[in-house]
Amino acid sequence: MNNAADIVNEFLRLIMIPDPVSASRYTAPDMKILFTGGRPMKEPADCTKFNASRYKWVKKRIERTDSVIASAEEAARGETVVYSIGTLYGEWPDGKPFEGNRYVDRYVVKNGLITHMDVWNDSAEWILVRAGLAVL
């Protein structure tokens, strides 16, 4: 699997099973993860553990995967930037289902491995709405 977008999509398929051990075969040993809320993490299993504390279960509905034309600096380093864009669906810890929760993930792929992963989604907003502190 040489295409950076294919690598990211397979990583996401595995991490959403969840199978962070298998997903790790697509990550560099020194991978840097910045999860929602600016939480630094070291490996895919950290993401799975965090998601287990926030959701009963969660999956991604990938709407598109975009490989971005590299900047001169990224190209010189052999990096490809990939964005995965879509929505989350699943159940909150109390069993209430949700869907349509937007996400954007940014990945850097080098030599067939993911070296950086940044994750954003609307879950915090949805939690505020459920608490009666915001309106969507």
What is each residue range found by the language model?
Residues M1-Y26:
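Short acidic-aromatic low-complexity motifs
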Residues P20-T80:
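A solvent-exposed, acidic/Ser-Thr-rich amphipathic alpha-helical stretch
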Residues D30-K32, I85-E91:
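Generic short beta-strand segments
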Residues K59, Y89-E99:
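Short, cysteine-centered beta-strand-loop-beta hairpins and adjacent loop/turn segments enriched
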Residues A75-E79, Y107-I114:
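Short, solvent-exposed coil/turn segments at beta-strand boundaries
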Residues Y83-I85, V104-R106:
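Conserved hydrophobic/aromatic beta-strand scaffold that supports enzyme active sites
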Residues H116-L136:
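Low-complexity, intrinsically disordered terminal/linker segments enriched in charged
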